[in-house]
Amino acid sequence: MRIGQLARITGVKSETIRFYEREGILAAPPRTKANYRDYGPAEEARLTFIRRARDLGFSMARIREL
């Protein structure tokens, strides 16, 4: 799935997903031949975990460690 689809499913903005990738909190997914990010179930699960951890008050540094 593309970043927009992942954003809609998880409730996390596309810009935030890109930020998490740059910071190494979310692994960058493989790219399609057209150079689109190609997210799968593992990235969706990780992003959902990150969102819930943030809601519980975990710092970004702590989430990166988990």
Q: What function would you assign to each model-found segment?
A:
Residues R2-I9, A27-K33, D38-L66:
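Arg/Lys-rich, alpha-helical DNA-contact motif
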Residues G24:
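Glycine-centered, phosphate/nucleic-acid-interacting loop/turn motifs that mediate DNA/RNA or nucleotide
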